[in-house]
UniProtKB/Swiss-Prot annotation:
One of its GO terms (cellular component) is cytosol. It holds the Pfam family Chor_lyase. PANTHER family: CHORISMATE PYRUVATE-LYASE. InterPro entries: Chorismate--pyruvate_lyase (IPR007440), Chorismate_lyase_/UTRA_dom_sf (IPR028978). Removes the pyruvyl group from chorismate, with concomitant aromatization of the ring, to provide 4-hydroxybenzoate (4HB) for the ubiquinone pathway. It is found in: Cytoplasm. Belongs to the UbiC family. Its EC number is 4.1.3.40. It comes from Ralstonia nicotianae (strain ATCC BAA-1114 / GMI1000). GO terms for biological process: pyruvate biosynthetic process; ubiquinone biosynthetic process. Keywords: Cytoplasm, Lyase, Pyruvate, Ubiquinone biosynthesis. Substrate binds at R79, L117, E180. It catalyses: chorismate = 4-hydroxybenzoate + pyruvate. This is Probable chorismate pyruvate-lyase. The gene is ubiC.
């Protein structure tokens, strides 16, 4: 995680799925599930685990801070993990929340460690999920660079694009932005029926 605000030429995020010819039907089936992605990944694999890459204070990306309702870029608590199915990293997940709201509305976050965030969010009836936004992120996007660094590889060229989705969770008066980048290894796992 970087302590400096990251910029990217323009926001790739859209409220509708990209066309199937671009996004791919397989990826779309993973992206549109309304329930916990963690539960769906567990159902699609024989083993599942979370690898915590880092958690700490960081400035949000340029297209993120407004999602939290912040008037300007301000330090957030950021959490980055890999979701791993059958020992293959299949999702890079990036979460940000304003630090002041952690104690009041997201008290579990600081001690979550390698436990899945999705389980905590979907088990709490006071948490509401907002609409999804979707993107195809190319190799220049900071989250793709971080995902490839976590995998120990070199960032792909600007033409390599990874499907991603994000949504805002609300509890009380605070917001949490969760972004999930689908990694190539997810291609071998069939999404379970809509859960």
């Amino acid at each position: 995680m970087s302590g400096a605000a990251m910029s990217y030429p323009r926001s790739p995020w859209r409220g509708a799925l990209p066309p199937m010819a671009v996004y791919g039907q397989h990826w779309a089936r993973w992206a549109v599930g309304v329930n916990s992605l963690t539960a769906r990944l567990r159902a699609a694999s024989s083993s599942f685990r979370v690898e915590l890459l880092g958690q700490g204070r960081a400035l949000p990306l340029r297209d993120e801070w407004r999602c939290l309702g912040l008037p300007r870029a301000a330090e957030t608590l950021a959490r980055e993990v890999l979701l791993i199915c059958d020992e293959a990293p299949v999702v890079y997940a990036h979460t940000i929340v304003h630090p002041r709201s952690v104690a009041a509305d997201w008290p579990f976050l600081r001690a979550l460690g390698t436990q899945p965030l999705g389980h905590a969010l979907f088990a709490d009836p006071r948490v509401a999920r907002g609409a999804f936004e979707f993107a195809l992120l190319d190799g220049r996007h900071p989250l793709v660079k971080r995902a490839h660094a976590a995998l120990g590889g070199t960032p792909p060229g600007a033409m390599a694009r990874l499907p991603a989705r994000r949504s805002v969770f609300r509890r009380g008066v605070s917001a949490m932005l969760v972004t999930e980048v689908f990694l190539p290894a997810l291609a071998v796992f069939d999404p379970p029926p809509m859960m």
